[in-house]
From Swiss-Prot:
InterPro entries with a match to the protein in the record: ACT-like_dom_sf, ACT_dom, UPF0237/GcvR_regulator, UPF0237_ACT
Domain of life, source organism: Archaea
PANTHER family: UPF0237 PROTEIN MJ1558
Domain ACT: 7-81
S-S bonds: none
Species classification: Archaea, Methanobacteriati, Methanobacteriota, Stenosarchaea group, Methanomicrobia
Species of origin: Methanosarcina mazei (strain ATCC BAA-159 / DSM 3647 / Goe1 / Go1 / JCM 11833 / OCM 88)
NCBIfam families: PRK00194.1
Protein's name according to its UniProt entry: UPF0237 protein MM_0082
């Protein structure tokens, strides 16, 4: 299966259900978590994931919109970036 990898970041005030609801949206788009790191710093929830989605029949714009909408309903900020763009922006 060919795939495309993304970096997904989630930041906001901690509350119950953030991981469950964000990953439910991901599963509905057949997006798999390759790696994940999550922590809470003084009440601020932070999570970064390396995720993989099928290249075929994957609508990135719709996925980004769904993730953004879920983030807004949770009161957190969700960013979805293609791995290549993320690496380019964060190179030294």
């Amino acid at each position: 299966m060919t795939s495309s990898r993304f970096i997904i970041t989630v930041i906001g005030s901690d509350r119950v259900g953030i991981v469950a609801r964000i990953t439910t949206v991901m599963a509905s788009y057949n997006v798999n978590i390759v790696d994940i790191s999550q922590t809470i710093m003084q009440g601020i929830f932070t999570m970064i994931m390396l995720a993989e989605a099928p290249k075929e029949n994957f609508d990135l714009a719709a996925f980004q919109q769904a993730m953004d909408a879920e983030g807004k309903s949770l009161g957190v900020e969700v960013k979805v970036q293609h791995e290549d763009a993320f690496r380019f922006m964060h190179r030294i």
